[in-house]
């Protein structure tokens, strides 16, 4: 069982490291997403600028990416001694990791989904409400934001995988029951 637990710890450490890297990459792309253009209005030019902080959905995604990256790094640092065989998180610690993996997956999924809706409206517009598409003018901004959102969805998938790995570690270590441990009784009709 010790090798199996170290295997789970190894998988967990690797996936957590990858998740933190993906979240940080998404965060950097979103923080760098800014574009300024000059638009012709009559005989004059007007300067327009767009950045991530103009929309609350993108700000929510920034904070969610920060939260996921920090959480993964903190848990990663805490799991390194366990992977080396020096100490293992107790039942309460494993439950906390299991729950937070799921909660943060849902938080990041909500943030990435709301940012996707805003990016869709920026790309397509909405004729019924007279919202015009801004991506034709701010193409670089839109491409950068979409890359960031895509990385956030990758991080969501990695967090979901982490939830499975942490559940396997938790239930495999503390709630193991042998398969078919209870003998079934049956009556024969004679």
Curated annotation (Swiss-Prot):
It is a multi-pass membrane protein. Keywords: Cell membrane, Membrane, Transmembrane, Transmembrane helix. Its main location: membrane. The chain crosses the membrane at residues 11-31, 60-80, 95-115, 145-165. Residues 1-10, 81-94, 166-190 are cytoplasmic. The keyword Transmembrane helix applies. Signal peptide: none annotated. InterPro entries: CASP/CASPL, CASP_dom. It is found in: Cell membrane. It holds the Pfam family CASP_dom. Belongs to the Casparian strip membrane proteins (CASP) family. This is CASP-like protein 2U2. It comes from Pteridium aquilinum subsp. aquilinum (Bracken fern).
